[in-house]
Amino acid sequence: MKMRNHKENGNGSEMGESTKSLAKMEPENNNKISVVSVSKLLLKDSNGANSRSSNSNASFSSASVAGSVQDDLPHHNSSSSQLGQQHGSSLDQCGLTQAGLEEYNNRSSSYYDQTAFHHQKQPSYAQSEGYHSYVSSSDSTSATPFLDKLRQESDLLSRQSHHWSENDLSSVCSNSVAPSPIPLLARQSHSHSHSHAHSHSNSHGHSHGHAHSASSSSSSNNNSNGSATNNNNNNSSESTSSTETLKWLGSMSDISEASHATGYSAISESVSSSQRIVHSSRVPTPKRHHSESVLYLHNNEEQGDSSPTASNSSQMMISEEANGEESPPSVQPLRIQHRHSPSYPPVHTSMVLHHFQQQQQQQQDYQHPSRHHTNQSTLSTQSSLLELASPTEKPRSLMGQSHSMGDLQQKNPHQNPMLGRSAGQQHKSSISVTISSSEAVVTIAPQPPAGKPSKLQLSLGKSEALSCSTPNMGEQSPTNSIDSYRSNHRLFPVSTYTEPVHSNTSQYVQHPKPQFSSGLHKSAKLPVITPAGATVQPTWHSVAERINDFERSQLGEPPKFAYLEPTKTHRLSNPALKALQKNAVQSYVERQQQQQKEEQQLLRPHSQSYQACHVERKSLPNNLSPIMVGLPTGSNSASTRDCSSPTPPPPPRRSGSLLPNLLRRSSSASDYAEFRELHQAQGQVKGPSIRNISNAEKISFNDCGMPPPPPPPRGRLAVPTRRTSSATEYAPMRDKLLLQQAAALAHQQHHPQQHRHAQPPHVPPERPPKHPNLRVPSPELPPPPQSELDISYTFDEPLPPPPPPEVLQPRPPPSPNRRNCFAGASTRRTTYEAPPPTAIVAAKVPPLVPKKPTSLQHKHLANGGGGSRKRPHHATPQPILENVASPVAPPPPLLPRARSTAHDNVIASNLESNQQKRSNSKASYLPRQSLEKLNNTDPDHGIYKLTLTSNEDLVAHTKPSYGVTGKLPNNLPDVLPLGVKLHQQPKLQPGSPNGDANVTLRYGSNNNLTGNSPTVAPPPYYGGGQRYSTPVLGQGYGKSSKPVTPQQYTRSQSYDVKHTSAVTMPTMSQSHVDLKQAAHDLETTLEEVLPTATPTPTPTPTPTPPRLSPASSHSDCSLSTSSLECTINPIATPIPKPEAHIFRAEVISTTLNTNPLTTPPKPAMNRQESLRENIEKITQLQSVLMSAHLCDASLLGGYTTPLITSPTASFANEPLMTPPLPPSPPPPLEPEEEEEQEENDVHDKQPEIEELQLMQRSELVLMVNPKPSTTDMACQTDELEDRDTDLEAAREEHQTRTTLQPRQRQPIELDYEQMSRELVKLLPPGDKIADILTPKICKPTSQYVSNLYNPDVPLRLAKRDVGTSTLMRMKSITSSAEIRVVSVELQLAEPSEEPTNLIKQKMDELIKHLNQKIVSLKREQQTISEECSANDRLGQDLFAKLAEKVRPSEASKFRTHVDAVGNITSLLLSLSERLAQTESSLETRQQERGALESKRDLLYEQMEEAQRLKSDIERRGVSIAGLLAKNLSADMCADYDYFINMKAKLIADARDLAVRIKGSEEQLSSLSDALVQSDC
């Protein structure tokens, strides 16, 4: 459909429907567009536009570029606007106002700051004749398709940095373009509406709604480019903003036949069939060629040229028949088929358009020199420009853009006639589209060649979306015809390459130049530019020729490596070759372009005022509008902007790897370096460059290799997110200043944009010094390592306030230092380290910490130790103070990484432990070490590192190290009240080395840590907070333990779970100060300063520090009430003597602190190792004791006490221990933490002993008595009665007992039973719920079946995780169970007011606990399943080895025997279960007694038979064992013994778990039903 060229461009309100489809469908609308308003779409009221165009470039964001040439563009009124001249006032602009443009620019800048660079890049490349020649190197359409393909591939490559894919671009078109460009589009669309430029979605643009439409249409364009007007809008804008290589507003000119799917249009549209590709003028980003829009500006060239593609889709030929003379310059059917890429390539677009314009103008000038100035700009407005500018552009269908190539191409050669512009008439009015920053300014100056009213037929050719890939720019006048098809194609990139296009050099005006703010005086300016252009032209031309030659020689040989492109309509050269060639060409062209740009810029000054605006916009994608630029943005003056814009564009564009906008392939660093060099050499105006740096440079920095998302960095600009450098980097420099500096550097690196924002104003010169092009300098930004630091940590946050050691209350001041110094290191360390610094740090830290504490329970723990390096929980650095207070200043190990020299010393040792421990603090930064390594590490050293160790490591890596011996005598004496240990430990766990070590120590969860010398032990546990440093105890840090209490409790490390719970619970930090003070008193007590060498000594929990209780309440409660068992009460006596109850491996090893009164062993124990181990053990044991053994009244009391302790100092003081607290989950850890902190103070005042009954369930029994003895031994005694003995034996045997033992019940199970019994006592007799809670007791299967496996078979810890499976299982279970228990304890800590409320409360807690129990059992069930798989693999390996050495029949015997063992075991267990159920029923169901008895008799018979079978199988097993002994090594025989027995054990354990899970679920269902009924 032709678009009638109306001189009356007065239809300012022409349908904004200038979508391509409109173009297609609304010839009449197009008619409305007056010829004069060739660029009318983009034009605003000539007056307003002119004024605007004179000073400000009408910039459109990429999205709006195509859609709207800024008012400036076509202001025929403005004398500067050639169009204005030609069109006269008829180019009434509808739409874009400067305010709108600015708004759009702002938006675009905010969204796509980096786009500016993209544009800059693109303009340079597009300008380069190299690209032009490259694009049109082969006249044949096939060659073009090949180029397109190359572009595609290149784009894909460069897209990596930009993260653009064709699809992405097309999709983004709608999204990204819409946001910023659309508003502009809306305005522009108004102006567009006159011309109904195809592109602006609903160019009607009268309504912003349309603008939005445009954005959405852009996406649709990408899809089908359809005939949706919206698509048009979007397309142009997309084209502008899209990162497509060319994404020029008027890229239509570069239509090649082979535009298969190279461009977005092709990709979005399947219409790649037209293989004619427009090589978008945005060649600078050749990669984005797919996005290139096809725009034929030459009237001369026959539409036929591109008709193949064009024919594809019926193109709406917007044939403005420019009559001429004045507005006759009809824009050639600029089919703007921008494949709009989502990015906001407005800059690109403007650049591209400009190049295109230049080319077109050149051609036009070449046809009509007189007009060429205007034409130049006119042509420049390529797809987008044309879309915007061409009066008939309405037809310029977005579909064209969609088709990126094809659409614009005039689909109908027939329409050519309609365009029927005489060659002479072809003077397309010059349409200049300047897109800078996010603005696209399209200036359409109808070229005066009055005599030659060449009808610029915008054969937008609505080539249906189909012809999208086919740029049918065919409608070219005979004159254009004269230009070879290639010329037309060149024309397409013309402005980009600035061919010597016949006629003024102005045509060469690089995009920036021709793209003045508006068409204002464009002709005049262009001439000014022309000199630059002229100078460049020859160069460009020579470059183009050279490139063409190169392409012809290499790319021109496509047939050599030819293959059919996807549409199979054209042969394309080897894609790889193309990519290489394209990259080379692009790089070369960009360099050339850059140089020429600079030269032109130098020449430009004449037209700088206008050009500068355009240039600036281009160069300042971030500065949405030139004015937006931080530099003399306000001044639209060309000089500043000119310089700045030219320079900035290339580098930023290049740099914009981060920005999708920076789609230009030329974004490679090398290219940028070259650009920089070129710019530097040319002496680009640095001022402008700096200014560009403000926005673009920031991006370029990012591009440099820092790929922070452009938008976020912008947003963050103000925010100095301090990303701590990696621990490795900062480990050496532990100074706060270093950390801060690093943070700043890292932040800059990571958020170069932000920094740039600041920089442009503040230090733009810094980056700019490199030259605008050198924005690429970003590579010089701080090394990536720092960025890693940045990313890794924020110094502010990472430094949690050191856990306020209760004892070290004076220490809180350290918080600031500590935090800063620690910056990533655990502040807890600081606590132990130099007390004074720590105190300081603590003071500062707390404020920062608060954030972290809340966020991470682990961080809270970190305060204690395990938590993150920060002391988030209470931000109280007091724990550290505690250390300080303690005579021992050695705590340095606890000090943050960046600490004083003393701290450094400690750190040196601590680093080891830290690495072992891996606290969130420093540990996070430092490379993590394996748990084993950590375990191996000396606890003393480990402490500091433990502090660093992240909780994650502690939790995740916590391996029960069974034989963790208190390497140092400094281990906290197990004697210390568990409450203290636990509390402190929890705190320690998070932050303090101990806390962190807890997990690590867990491995050696030897409470014994007997090596801990009492002296050191106390200081380490300055309350939960200190716990972090605790690990250092042994070294100087333990001593620093607050001497406040002679009893420097060296607390044994509690189980990792404890640590976890501590982490979970703010307990770590809860008593940071108070807890730590009291705790460290208590800790000593707890640790009992047993001789370091005496792990066995019974821990004498000292009741001294009540605060210990708080600490323990936090950690203990969370871990297990039992651990808190040693209540804050000075006398923890209620707790059974810490006869360490060691439960066999699986069984919980419980250590009851018998010496509750044991005054805090004043001897400060070296807590380093013992603390870690003890903490681990304590944690684990606590959970176990809590669940299983805390059932004892004393244990219950312990529960209550811990809870109370943490909640209230008074509780700690009181023998809260007495009130049994059922262990419950410690959900309210943080709140507790706070409470405990408060209470900690009280606790500090109130000494109390918390005995700690630690039950550790694991195959290895960790005896975490308050005693330092570490009974990692997996002592699995069936009876709790045996536990004491076992514990004793364990202490002696240590790890000797690691045999297969029956599954031990989890602490949570025991806790639940205890809670159930308590609740039943409160219920009235006969209550339904009581019946549910007291299910009938069945005899254990062990009474019916025994010897299912040999319990004497040693565990194979090394071989199977399963070996420790029970242990591991129990550990994991205990950790979770302990945490849950803690919550319950806390809740139960306070007695209920009324019986009814009490019952309801207990019932709720019981149900919650039951749910937790089920979850825990299921988790264990899953673990057993994994163990079974591992064991089966072991059996398969043995079978495979045996099969290699024996006959198949013998090997089959082995397999048969293995299967038989599994079957008989399952059978015996099943029969025993049924027997137990039957006999249990006999007692209750008397009426069915007869039937039940007969059933029981039958089962006995079956059982006897099964026993006989079992004995037969065992005999066969002996023969199998003999077979193995003959053929396999002793180790393999041992493996077999283990395998066969483990198989039976796992079957038994799995059945036991299944039964318990089923029963628990039934009980839960019954309870729920009963409660519902009772409530009713």
Swiss-Prot record:
The modification Phosphoserine is found at S404, S667, S668. GO terms for molecular function: actin binding; actin filament binding; kinase binding; protein homodimerization activity. Residues 1232-1296 form a coiled coil. Residues 10-21, 305-317, 399-415, 633-643, 910-923, 1042-1055 have a biased composition (Polar residues). Keywords: Cell junction, Cell membrane, Coiled coil, Cytoplasm, Cytoskeleton, Developmental protein, Membrane, Microtubule, Phosphoprotein. Residues 46-69, 76-91, 128-142, 212-244, 267-283, 376-388 have a biased composition (Low complexity). The keyword S-adenosyl-L-methionine does not apply. Residues 445-920 are annotated as: F-actin binding region required for planar polarity and cortical localization. GO terms for cellular component: adherens junction; apical junction complex; apical plasma membrane; bicellular tight junction; cell-cell junction; cortical actin cytoskeleton; cytoskeleton; microtubule. It comes from the Eukaryota. Disruption phenotype: During axis elongation in the embryo decreases localization to adherens junctions and planar polarization for both Rho-kinase Rok and myosin regulatory light chain sqh. The mislocalization of sqh impairs the generation of sustained actomyosin contractility during cell rearrangement and can account for the reduction in the formation of multicellular rosette and convergent extension. RNAi-mediated knockdown in the embryo decreases Rho-kinase Rok localization to adherens junctions and planar polarization during axis elongation. Has no effect on Rho1 localization or activity. Residues 189-211, 748-759 have a biased composition (Basic residues). Binds to Rho-kinase Rok and targets it to the apical cell cortex where it mediates apical constriction. During embryogenic axis elongation, required for the localization to adherens junctions and the establishment of planar polarization of both Rho-kinase Rok and myosin regulatory light chain sqh. May be involved in the assembly of microtubule arrays during cell elongation. Monomer or homodimer. Interacts with Rok. This is Protein Shroom. It comes from Drosophila melanogaster (Fruit fly). The gene is Shrm.
